[in-house]
């Protein structure tokens, strides 16, 4: 998959000279993503992996097909490598907890002095 995302793909930048540097907290979405989300909410909004009715099945299919699309986009070996979380903090916590049995006494966890607090505490906890 070849992709070239440009600033012009993001509607938020259309009307003002915005410089946005807080993507770790909330990332801006390109128009294609906004349009796809809007369409999903309008036509397939239901619980994913829980509903046995048609609308729920469609919602689950869209959810899982997005995993495939993302897997292709990031060149993952498998869509099973793509995990959805509520945000970066949850992702970091999930990663650090998943490494708990792999980390051994004497191993080093390296962080820069510029890390956000949410990327320090999970590693401090793991180091204990």
PLM segments and residue spans:
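Pyridoxal 5′-phosphate
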Residues: 1-128
């Amino acid at each position: 998959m070849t992709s070239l995302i440009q600033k012009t793909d993001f509607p938020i930048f259309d009307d003002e000279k915005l410089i946005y540097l807080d993507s770790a907290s909330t990332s801006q979405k390109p128009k294609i993503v906004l349009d796809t989300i809007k369409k999903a909410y309008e036509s397939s909004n239901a619980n994913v992996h829980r509903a046995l009715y048609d609308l729920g099945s469609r919602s689950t299919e869209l959810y899982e097909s997005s995993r495939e699309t993302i897997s292709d986009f990031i060149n993952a070996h498998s869509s099973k490598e793509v995990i959805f979380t509520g945000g970066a903090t949850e992702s970091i916590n999930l990663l650090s907890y998943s490494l708990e049995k792999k980390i051994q006494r004497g191993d080093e966890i390296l962080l820069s002095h510029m890390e956000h607090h949410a990327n320090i505490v999970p590693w401090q906890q793991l180091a204990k």
